[in-house]
Curated annotation (Swiss-Prot):
It is found in: Cytoplasm. Its cofactor is Mg(2+). One of its GO terms (molecular function) is DNA binding. Has at least 2 separable functions; Holliday junction resolution with generation of monomeric chromosomes, and negative modulation of RecA activity. Endonuclease that resolves Holliday junction intermediates in genetic recombination. Cleaves mobile four-strand junctions by introducing symmetrical nicks in paired strands. Promotes annealing of linear ssDNA with homologous dsDNA. Required for DNA repair, homologous recombination and chromosome segregation. Partially inhibits the hydrolysis of dATP or rATP by RecA. Holliday junction resolution is stimulated by RuvB. This is Holliday junction resolvase RecU.
Length: 206
């Protein structure tokens, strides 16, 4: 039995045949996939086509009860998912270190900053200090956005100074880059990175 930090029991997802997967329409307003699913498929596409090497970091697990039916075998009877101390994804693109977090919200007017934790913000600041490319991919308001870490830090610092505890919809639209949903890749965030960090005419937004 594996449990999340909130005590809920982990239920593995049912497998989906490759035939059914190919029939999914690339519509973000009516899709069967989560943001994580879309990003995993995107990263697989990048890897297969030798574009970038980006992987999702495994969720740390704390094992609390192990049964040994045989001397050479062990059965985990109880374990808990631990809260990650960093971000969801990391890897490399054109020699630059890539590190990002992925978040979703169903809020219709703003993106709550409570979706982040202090240690994640600190980790992203450390990545930026080492000249890494760090950002957040946000699914909100029926759209996917690419928000640079520096912009997130502004909203976070505002919250820490007893300011607004969320990013308004208009603020996100003003400071983030919308990512169009495609088929292969589904969420082409590398194209945004290319424009921001590798294009001769690149320029950060805002």
């Amino acid at each position: 039995m594996i449990r999340y930090p909130n005590g809920k029991t982990f239920q593995p997802k049912h497998s989906v045949s490759s035939q059914n997967s190919q029939k999914r329409a690339p519509s973000y307003s009516n899709r069967g996939m989560t943001l994580e699913d879309d990003l995993n498929e995107t990263n697989k596409y990048y890897l297969t086509n030798q574009i970038a090497v980006i992987h999702k970091k495994p969720t740390p697990v704390q094992i609390v009860n192990v049964h040994y039916p045989k001397r050479s075998a062990a059965v985990i009877k109880e374990a808990y998912f631990k809260q990650s101390s960093t971000t969801d994804y990391n890897g490399i693109y054109k020699g630059r270190y890539i590190d990002f977090e992925a978040k979703e919200t169903k809020n219709k007017t703003s993106f709550p900053l409570q979706n982040f934790h202090d240690h994640q913000i600190e980790h992203m600041k450390q990545v930026k200090a080492q000249d890494g490319i760090c950002f957040v991919i946000i699914s909100a308001f029926d759209q996917v956005y690419f928000l640079e870490a520096d912009k997130l830090f502004y909203f976070w610092d505002r919250k820490e100074k007893n300011g607004r505890k969320s990013i308004r919809k208009d603020e996100l639209e003003e400071t983030a880059y919308p990512i169009s949903l495609g088929y292969a890749p589904r969420i082409d965030y590398i194209s945004i990175i290319e424009q921001l960090y590798f294009s001769p005419s690149s320029g950060a937004k805002g």
